[in-house]
Protein backbone atom coordinates (compact mmCIF):
# COMPACT_ATOMS: atom_id res chain seq x y z
CA UNK A 1 0.00 0.00 0.00
CA UNK A 2 1.31 3.46 -0.93
CA UNK A 3 1.93 5.78 2.02
CA UNK A 4 -0.01 9.04 1.82
CA UNK A 5 2.15 12.14 1.90
CA UNK A 6 1.08 14.88 4.28
CA UNK A 7 -0.30 17.82 2.29
CA UNK A 8 -1.97 21.12 3.10
CA UNK A 9 -3.12 24.27 1.32
CA UNK A 10 0.47 25.54 1.06
CA UNK A 11 1.33 22.42 -0.93
CA UNK A 12 -0.97 23.64 -3.69
CA UNK A 13 1.08 26.81 -4.13
CA UNK A 14 4.24 24.71 -4.47
CA UNK A 15 3.17 21.97 -6.89
CA UNK A 16 0.10 22.95 -8.95
CA UNK A 17 0.18 25.11 -12.08
CA UNK A 18 -0.94 28.56 -10.87
CA UNK A 19 -4.16 28.78 -12.88
CA UNK A 20 -6.53 28.45 -9.90
CA UNK A 21 -7.09 30.38 -6.69
CA UNK A 22 -8.73 27.76 -4.46
CA UNK A 23 -10.20 28.36 -1.03
CA UNK A 24 -7.87 28.24 1.95
CA UNK A 25 -9.40 24.99 3.25
CA UNK A 26 -9.19 21.52 1.67
CA UNK A 27 -12.39 19.43 1.60
CA UNK A 28 -11.67 15.80 2.44
CA UNK A 29 -15.11 14.23 2.93
CA UNK A 30 -18.63 14.82 1.68
CA UNK A 31 -22.05 13.33 2.30
CA UNK A 32 -25.20 14.74 0.77
CA UNK A 33 -24.90 18.53 0.96
CA UNK A 34 -22.39 18.53 3.82
CA UNK A 35 -18.60 18.70 3.42
CA UNK A 36 -15.79 18.44 5.98
CA UNK A 37 -12.27 19.84 5.65
CA UNK A 38 -8.90 18.62 6.95
CA UNK A 39 -9.57 20.15 10.35
CA UNK A 40 -13.03 18.58 10.63
CA UNK A 41 -14.89 21.83 10.03
CA UNK A 42 -18.32 21.23 8.48
CA UNK A 43 -19.67 23.20 5.51
CA UNK A 44 -23.02 23.27 3.76
CA UNK A 45 -22.43 22.98 0.02
CA UNK A 46 -24.33 25.40 -2.22
CA UNK A 47 -21.60 25.22 -4.89
CA UNK A 48 -22.08 21.64 -6.04
CA UNK A 49 -18.60 21.50 -7.53
CA UNK A 50 -19.78 24.14 -10.05
CA UNK A 51 -23.13 22.45 -10.75
CA UNK A 52 -21.59 18.97 -10.88
CA UNK A 53 -22.67 17.08 -7.75
CA UNK A 54 -26.35 17.18 -8.69
CA UNK A 55 -27.20 14.40 -6.25
CA UNK A 56 -24.91 15.61 -3.50
CA UNK A 57 -21.72 13.95 -2.35
CA UNK A 58 -21.40 10.16 -2.39
CA UNK A 59 -25.00 9.42 -3.37
CA UNK A 60 -25.67 5.72 -2.62
CA UNK A 61 -26.82 4.91 -6.17
CA UNK A 62 -23.67 6.41 -7.68
CA UNK A 63 -21.36 4.82 -5.12
CA UNK A 64 -22.97 1.44 -5.79
CA UNK A 65 -22.63 1.81 -9.57
CA UNK A 66 -18.98 2.85 -9.28
CA UNK A 67 -18.16 0.02 -6.88
CA UNK A 68 -19.88 -2.61 -9.00
CA UNK A 69 -18.30 -1.44 -12.26
CA UNK A 70 -14.95 -0.92 -10.56
CA UNK A 71 -14.84 -4.63 -9.79
CA UNK A 72 -15.89 -5.58 -13.32
CA UNK A 73 -14.24 -3.55 -16.11
CA UNK A 74 -12.51 -0.16 -16.07
CA UNK A 75 -11.33 0.63 -19.57
CA UNK A 76 -11.25 -0.79 -23.09
CA UNK A 77 -10.76 2.28 -25.37
CA UNK A 78 -13.03 2.75 -28.37
CA UNK A 79 -11.33 -0.06 -30.23
CA UNK A 80 -14.10 -1.92 -28.38
CA UNK A 81 -17.50 -0.78 -27.17
CA UNK A 82 -18.92 -1.54 -23.73
CA UNK A 83 -22.30 -2.19 -22.14
CA UNK A 84 -22.52 0.85 -19.81
CA UNK A 85 -21.84 3.24 -22.72
CA UNK A 86 -24.50 1.63 -24.89
CA UNK A 87 -27.09 1.67 -22.10
CA UNK A 88 -26.37 5.30 -21.25
CA UNK A 89 -26.60 6.32 -24.90
CA UNK A 90 -29.94 4.54 -25.27
CA UNK A 91 -31.35 6.34 -22.23
CA UNK A 92 -30.13 9.78 -23.32
CA UNK A 93 -31.66 9.24 -26.76
CA UNK A 94 -34.95 8.10 -25.23
CA UNK A 95 -35.08 11.21 -23.02
CA UNK A 96 -34.21 13.83 -25.67
CA UNK A 97 -34.50 14.83 -29.34
CA UNK A 98 -31.30 12.98 -30.22
CA UNK A 99 -30.59 9.87 -32.28
CA UNK A 100 -26.81 9.66 -31.75
CA UNK A 101 -24.41 10.28 -28.87
CA UNK A 102 -20.67 10.92 -28.61
CA UNK A 103 -19.07 10.52 -25.18
CA UNK A 104 -16.05 12.45 -23.94
CA UNK A 105 -14.59 13.46 -20.59
CA UNK A 106 -15.32 17.16 -20.09
CA UNK A 107 -17.58 19.94 -21.24
CA UNK A 108 -14.80 21.44 -23.33
CA UNK A 109 -14.31 18.16 -25.17
CA UNK A 110 -18.03 17.80 -25.86
CA UNK A 111 -18.16 21.36 -27.18
CA UNK A 112 -15.03 20.84 -29.29
CA UNK A 113 -16.77 17.85 -30.85
CA UNK A 114 -19.95 19.86 -31.39
CA UNK A 115 -18.18 22.75 -33.12
CA UNK A 116 -16.16 20.40 -35.32
CA UNK A 117 -19.33 18.50 -36.23
CA UNK A 118 -21.20 21.70 -37.08
CA UNK A 119 -18.47 22.85 -39.46
CA UNK A 120 -17.96 19.42 -40.97
CA UNK A 121 -21.68 19.03 -41.60
CA UNK A 122 -21.91 22.43 -43.29
CA UNK A 123 -18.89 21.72 -45.49
CA UNK A 124 -20.07 18.24 -46.46
CA UNK A 125 -23.73 19.12 -47.05
CA UNK A 126 -23.54 22.72 -48.29
CA UNK A 127 -20.29 24.54 -49.08
CA UNK A 128 -16.60 24.63 -48.11
CA UNK A 129 -17.16 28.33 -47.35
CA UNK A 130 -19.98 27.73 -44.85
CA UNK A 131 -17.80 27.96 -41.74
CA UNK A 132 -18.97 31.01 -39.76
CA UNK A 133 -19.91 30.40 -36.13
CA UNK A 134 -22.05 32.99 -34.36
CA UNK A 135 -21.59 33.02 -30.59
CA UNK A 136 -22.23 35.47 -27.76
CA UNK A 137 -20.49 37.93 -25.50
CA UNK A 138 -19.92 36.62 -21.96
CA UNK A 139 -20.39 33.02 -23.07
CA UNK A 140 -18.21 30.18 -21.82
CA UNK A 141 -17.72 26.91 -23.69
CA UNK A 142 -14.45 25.49 -22.37
CA UNK A 143 -10.68 25.99 -22.37
CA UNK A 144 -9.44 24.37 -25.57
CA UNK A 145 -8.28 26.93 -28.13
CA UNK A 146 -11.40 26.38 -30.25
CA UNK A 147 -13.92 26.41 -27.40
CA UNK A 148 -12.33 29.34 -25.58
CA UNK A 149 -12.40 31.28 -28.84
CA UNK A 150 -16.10 30.56 -29.34
CA UNK A 151 -16.68 31.68 -25.77
CA UNK A 152 -17.07 35.42 -25.80
CA UNK A 153 -14.65 36.40 -23.03
CA UNK A 154 -11.28 37.81 -24.19
CA UNK A 155 -9.83 37.48 -20.67
CA UNK A 156 -9.81 33.72 -21.26
CA UNK A 157 -8.94 33.60 -24.97
CA UNK A 158 -6.31 36.33 -25.39
CA UNK A 159 -2.58 35.71 -25.07
CA UNK A 160 -2.29 32.39 -26.91
CA UNK A 161 -1.52 33.55 -30.41
CA UNK A 162 -3.76 33.21 -33.47
CA UNK A 163 -7.30 32.06 -32.75
CA UNK A 164 -9.51 29.88 -34.94
CA UNK A 165 -11.04 32.12 -37.59
CA UNK A 166 -14.60 32.90 -38.67
CA UNK A 167 -16.13 33.26 -35.20
CA UNK A 168 -18.43 36.24 -34.62
CA UNK A 169 -19.64 37.42 -31.20
CA UNK A 170 -22.81 39.43 -30.64
CA UNK A 171 -24.78 40.48 -27.53
CA UNK A 172 -26.80 37.73 -25.83
CA UNK A 173 -30.60 37.94 -26.10
CA UNK A 174 -30.28 40.42 -28.99
CA UNK A 175 -32.05 38.85 -31.95
CA UNK A 176 -31.45 41.86 -34.19
CA UNK A 177 -27.70 41.52 -33.62
CA UNK A 178 -27.83 37.87 -34.65
CA UNK A 179 -29.88 38.70 -37.73
CA UNK A 180 -27.38 41.39 -38.74
CA UNK A 181 -24.49 38.91 -39.00
CA UNK A 182 -26.42 35.81 -40.07
CA UNK A 183 -25.98 34.72 -43.68
CA UNK A 184 -25.64 31.63 -45.82
CA UNK A 185 -21.98 31.28 -44.80
CA UNK A 186 -23.07 30.61 -41.20
CA UNK A 187 -22.66 26.98 -40.18
CA UNK A 188 -23.92 27.32 -36.59
CA UNK A 189 -25.21 29.52 -33.83
CA UNK A 190 -23.79 28.40 -30.49
CA UNK A 191 -25.33 29.43 -27.17
CA UNK A 192 -26.00 28.53 -23.57
CA UNK A 193 -29.75 28.68 -22.84
CA UNK A 194 -28.65 29.92 -19.42
CA UNK A 195 -25.29 31.71 -19.50
CA UNK A 196 -23.41 30.39 -16.48
CA UNK A 197 -20.00 32.04 -16.23
CA UNK A 198 -21.54 35.09 -17.87
CA UNK A 199 -23.64 35.86 -14.79
CA UNK A 200 -26.60 33.40 -14.76
CA UNK A 201 -28.52 35.06 -17.58
CA UNK A 202 -31.39 33.10 -19.14
CA UNK A 203 -32.30 33.35 -22.79
CA UNK A 204 -35.75 34.76 -23.46
CA UNK A 205 -38.22 32.48 -25.27
CA UNK A 206 -38.55 35.03 -28.07
CA UNK A 207 -34.79 35.08 -28.55
CA UNK A 208 -34.41 31.31 -28.79
CA UNK A 209 -37.41 30.99 -31.08
CA UNK A 210 -36.04 33.74 -33.31
CA UNK A 211 -32.58 32.19 -33.47
CA UNK A 212 -34.12 28.82 -34.34
CA UNK A 213 -36.01 30.45 -37.21
CA UNK A 214 -32.87 32.20 -38.49
CA UNK A 215 -30.92 28.93 -38.40
CA UNK A 216 -33.65 27.20 -40.39
CA UNK A 217 -33.73 30.05 -42.90
CA UNK A 218 -29.97 29.90 -43.52
CA UNK A 219 -29.42 26.12 -43.20
CA UNK A 220 -27.32 26.66 -40.06
CA UNK A 221 -27.25 24.38 -37.04
CA UNK A 222 -28.40 25.48 -33.60
CA UNK A 223 -26.00 24.24 -30.92
CA UNK A 224 -27.02 24.37 -27.26
CA UNK A 225 -24.29 24.17 -24.64
CA UNK A 226 -26.07 22.62 -21.66
CA UNK A 227 -22.90 21.65 -19.83
CA UNK A 228 -24.05 23.64 -16.79
CA UNK A 229 -27.80 23.97 -17.34
CA UNK A 230 -28.47 20.33 -18.21
CA UNK A 231 -29.21 17.19 -16.22
CA UNK A 232 -32.09 18.62 -14.21
CA UNK A 233 -30.41 21.85 -13.15
CA UNK A 234 -33.19 24.02 -14.63
CA UNK A 235 -36.07 21.93 -13.31
CA UNK A 236 -36.35 19.87 -16.49
CA UNK A 237 -33.83 17.31 -17.69
CA UNK A 238 -32.46 19.87 -20.16
CA UNK A 239 -33.28 23.55 -20.18
CA UNK A 240 -34.26 23.59 -23.88
CA UNK A 241 -37.38 21.71 -22.76
CA UNK A 242 -38.69 24.89 -21.08
CA UNK A 243 -38.66 26.81 -24.35
CA UNK A 244 -40.22 24.58 -26.97
CA UNK A 245 -37.09 25.10 -29.06
CA UNK A 246 -35.12 22.03 -30.11
CA UNK A 247 -31.42 22.30 -30.96
CA UNK A 248 -29.62 20.33 -33.65
CA UNK A 249 -26.70 19.55 -31.35
CA UNK A 250 -26.63 19.56 -27.55
CA UNK A 251 -23.71 19.16 -25.18
CA UNK A 252 -23.85 18.08 -21.56
CA UNK A 253 -21.26 17.29 -18.88
CA UNK A 254 -20.88 18.42 -15.25
CA UNK A 255 -23.89 16.75 -13.56
CA UNK A 256 -24.02 13.94 -16.12
CA UNK A 257 -21.65 11.91 -13.96
CA UNK A 258 -22.69 13.44 -10.66
CA UNK A 259 -19.02 14.09 -9.91
CA UNK A 260 -17.37 11.48 -12.11
CA UNK A 261 -15.82 13.06 -15.25
CA UNK A 262 -17.93 12.44 -18.35
CA UNK A 263 -19.54 14.49 -21.10
CA UNK A 264 -21.74 13.85 -24.08
CA UNK A 265 -22.63 15.44 -27.40
CA UNK A 266 -26.11 14.61 -28.68
CA UNK A 267 -27.35 15.09 -32.24
CA UNK A 268 -29.66 13.77 -34.92
CA UNK A 269 -29.18 10.90 -37.35
CA UNK A 270 -28.93 13.25 -40.34
CA UNK A 271 -26.20 15.41 -38.80
CA UNK A 272 -24.31 12.43 -37.39
CA UNK A 273 -24.26 10.78 -40.81
CA UNK A 274 -21.45 13.04 -42.08
CA UNK A 275 -19.03 11.54 -39.56
CA UNK A 276 -17.03 8.46 -40.43
CA UNK A 277 -14.49 6.33 -38.62
CA UNK A 278 -11.56 8.53 -37.63
CA UNK A 279 -13.15 11.95 -38.18
CA UNK A 280 -13.23 12.41 -34.41
CA UNK A 281 -12.45 10.34 -31.35
CA UNK A 282 -11.14 10.00 -27.82
CA UNK A 283 -9.35 7.34 -25.80
CA UNK A 284 -11.24 7.65 -22.52
CA UNK A 285 -14.62 8.87 -23.79
CA UNK A 286 -17.42 6.46 -22.97
CA UNK A 287 -15.32 4.40 -20.59
CA UNK A 288 -17.25 1.82 -18.54
CA UNK A 289 -16.60 3.45 -15.14
CA UNK A 290 -17.87 6.87 -16.16
CA UNK A 291 -20.84 5.54 -18.08
CA UNK A 292 -21.95 3.24 -15.28
CA UNK A 293 -21.98 6.15 -12.84
CA UNK A 294 -23.68 8.46 -15.35
CA UNK A 295 -26.36 5.88 -16.05
CA UNK A 296 -27.10 5.72 -12.34
CA UNK A 297 -27.17 9.52 -12.12
CA UNK A 298 -29.55 9.79 -15.07
CA UNK A 299 -31.82 7.12 -13.60
CA UNK A 300 -32.17 9.10 -10.37
CA UNK A 301 -32.34 12.62 -11.81
CA UNK A 302 -34.79 11.91 -14.63
CA UNK A 303 -37.65 11.09 -12.27
CA UNK A 304 -40.69 13.09 -11.14
CA UNK A 305 -39.51 12.79 -7.55
CA UNK A 306 -36.33 14.75 -8.27
CA UNK A 307 -37.45 17.09 -11.06
CA UNK A 308 -40.70 18.08 -9.34
CA UNK A 309 -38.85 19.05 -6.18
CA UNK A 310 -36.53 21.54 -7.86
CA UNK A 311 -39.02 24.39 -8.19
CA UNK A 312 -39.86 24.22 -4.47
CA UNK A 313 -36.18 24.44 -3.62
CA UNK A 314 -35.74 27.30 -6.10
CA UNK A 315 -38.49 29.20 -4.30
CA UNK A 316 -36.87 28.71 -0.91
CA UNK A 317 -33.52 30.02 -2.14
CA UNK A 318 -35.05 33.05 -3.86
CA UNK A 319 -37.22 33.86 -0.85
CA UNK A 320 -34.18 33.76 1.43
CA UNK A 321 -32.14 35.93 -0.95
CA UNK A 322 -34.98 38.44 -1.09
CA UNK A 323 -35.09 38.47 2.71
CA UNK A 324 -31.36 39.24 2.87
CA UNK A 325 -31.83 41.96 0.29
CA UNK A 326 -34.67 43.58 2.21
CA UNK A 327 -32.30 44.03 5.15
CA UNK A 328 -29.07 44.99 3.40
CA UNK A 329 -29.98 46.19 -0.11
CA UNK A 330 -27.03 44.27 -1.53
CA UNK A 331 -28.54 42.68 -4.67
CA UNK A 332 -29.67 44.53 -7.77
CA UNK A 333 -31.13 41.38 -9.33
CA UNK A 334 -31.94 37.81 -8.30
CA UNK A 335 -32.30 35.54 -11.30
CA UNK A 336 -31.88 32.07 -12.71
CA UNK A 337 -33.84 28.93 -13.32
CA UNK A 338 -34.29 25.89 -11.10
CA UNK A 339 -31.21 25.42 -8.95
CA UNK A 340 -28.89 27.62 -10.98
CA UNK A 341 -29.39 30.95 -9.24
CA UNK A 342 -27.52 34.23 -9.54
CA UNK A 343 -27.65 37.24 -7.22
CA UNK A 344 -26.09 40.32 -8.79
CA UNK A 345 -24.43 42.77 -6.41
CA UNK A 346 -25.47 46.41 -6.37
CA UNK A 347 -23.09 49.11 -7.59
CA UNK A 348 -21.93 49.71 -4.02
CA UNK A 349 -20.57 46.15 -3.77
CA UNK A 350 -19.60 45.64 -7.41
CA UNK A 351 -16.43 43.60 -7.79
CA UNK A 352 -16.66 42.07 -4.30
CA UNK A 353 -18.11 38.66 -5.14
CA UNK A 354 -15.00 36.77 -4.04
CA UNK A 355 -14.96 38.69 -0.75
CA UNK A 356 -18.47 37.40 -0.07
CA UNK A 357 -17.33 33.87 -1.02
CA UNK A 358 -14.54 34.02 1.55
CA UNK A 359 -16.95 35.30 4.19
CA UNK A 360 -19.36 32.47 3.40
CA UNK A 361 -16.57 29.91 3.81
CA UNK A 362 -15.64 31.46 7.15
CA UNK A 363 -19.24 30.86 8.19
CA UNK A 364 -19.35 27.24 7.03
CA UNK A 365 -20.91 27.70 3.60
CA UNK A 366 -19.61 26.93 0.10
CA UNK A 367 -20.91 29.19 -2.68
CA UNK A 368 -19.69 30.36 -6.09
CA UNK A 369 -19.34 33.52 -8.09
CA UNK A 370 -20.20 34.08 -11.75
CA UNK A 371 -17.84 36.90 -12.56
CA UNK A 372 -16.86 39.63 -10.08
CA UNK A 373 -20.40 40.91 -9.51
CA UNK A 374 -22.64 37.85 -9.18
CA UNK A 375 -23.01 35.28 -6.40
CA UNK A 376 -23.93 31.88 -7.84
CA UNK A 377 -25.76 29.03 -6.12
CA UNK A 378 -25.74 25.59 -7.77
CA UNK A 379 -26.51 23.10 -4.99
CA UNK A 380 -27.56 19.48 -5.12
CA UNK A 381 -30.92 18.97 -6.80
CA UNK A 382 -31.99 16.88 -3.81
CA UNK A 383 -30.60 19.12 -1.08
CA UNK A 384 -32.49 18.74 2.18
CA UNK A 385 -34.84 21.63 2.94
CA UNK A 386 -33.21 21.98 6.35
CA UNK A 387 -29.83 22.41 4.66
CA UNK A 388 -31.27 25.24 2.56
CA UNK A 389 -32.61 26.97 5.66
CA UNK A 390 -29.39 26.57 7.64
CA UNK A 391 -27.18 27.46 4.69
CA UNK A 392 -29.07 30.64 3.89
CA UNK A 393 -28.84 31.67 7.55
CA UNK A 394 -25.07 31.23 7.25
CA UNK A 395 -25.07 33.27 4.03
CA UNK A 396 -26.96 36.09 5.72
CA UNK A 397 -24.43 36.10 8.55
CA UNK A 398 -21.58 36.17 6.01
CA UNK A 399 -23.15 39.00 4.02
CA UNK A 400 -23.65 41.01 7.19
CA UNK A 401 -20.01 40.55 8.20
CA UNK A 402 -18.82 42.08 4.91
CA UNK A 403 -21.43 44.82 4.76
CA UNK A 404 -20.94 45.94 8.34
CA UNK A 405 -17.17 45.56 8.11
Curated annotation (Swiss-Prot):
PTM sites of type N6-(pyridoxal phosphate)lysine: 254
Residues given in the record as pyridoxal 5'-phosphate binding sites: 107-108, 140, 225-228, 283
Record Gene3D superfamilies: Aspartate Aminotransferase, domain 1, Type I PLP-dependent aspartate aminotransferase-like (Major domain)
GO molecular function, one term: pyridoxal phosphate binding
Compartments it resides in: Cytoplasm
GO terms of biological process kind: L-arginine biosynthetic process; lysine biosynthetic process via diaminopimelate
Pfam families linked to this entry: Aminotran_3
Note describing how the cofactor binds: Binds 1 pyridoxal phosphate per subunit.
Family annotation (InterPro entries): Ac/SucOrn_transaminase_bac, AcOrn/SuccOrn_fam, Aminotrans_3, Aminotrans_3_PPA_site, Class-III_PLP-dep_AT, PyrdxlP-dep_Trfase, PyrdxlP-dep_Trfase_major, PyrdxlP-dep_Trfase_small
Cofactor: pyridoxal 5'-phosphate
One GO cellular component term: cytoplasm
Catalytic activity: N(2)-acetyl-L-ornithine + 2-oxoglutarate = N-acetyl-L-glutamate 5-semialdehyde + L-glutamate; N-succinyl-(2S,6S)-2,6-diaminopimelate + 2-oxoglutarate = (S)-2-succinylamino-6-oxoheptanedioate + L-glutamate
Membrane spanning residue stretches: none
PROSITE patterns per UniProt: AA_TRANSFER_CLASS_3
Keyword Transferase: yes
Binding site for N(2)-acetyl-L-ornithine: 143, 282
Pathway stated in the Swiss-Prot or TrEMBL entry: Amino-acid biosynthesis; L-arginine biosynthesis; N(2)-acetyl-L-ornithine from L-glutamate: step 4/4; Amino-acid biosynthesis; L-lysine biosynthesis via DAP pathway; LL-2,6-diaminopimelate from (S)-tetrahydrodipicolinate (succinylase route): step 2/3
Assembly notes: Homodimer.
Its biological purpose: Involved in both the arginine and lysine biosynthetic pathways.
Stored HAMAP family: ArgD_aminotrans_3 (MF_01107)
Protein name, as recorded: Acetylornithine/succinyldiaminopimelate aminotransferase
Organism: Yersinia pestis
Amino acid sequence: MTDKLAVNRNTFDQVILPVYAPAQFIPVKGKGSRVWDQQGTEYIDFAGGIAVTALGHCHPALVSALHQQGETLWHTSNVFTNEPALRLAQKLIAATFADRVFFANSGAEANEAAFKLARHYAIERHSPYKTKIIAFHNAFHGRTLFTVSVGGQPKYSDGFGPKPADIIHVPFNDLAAVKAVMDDHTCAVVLEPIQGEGGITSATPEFLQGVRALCDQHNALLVFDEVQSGMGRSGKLFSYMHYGVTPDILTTAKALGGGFPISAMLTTEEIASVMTVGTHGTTYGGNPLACAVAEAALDVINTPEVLNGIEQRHGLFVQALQSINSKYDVFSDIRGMGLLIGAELTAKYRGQAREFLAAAAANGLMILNAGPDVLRLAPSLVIELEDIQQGMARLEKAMASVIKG
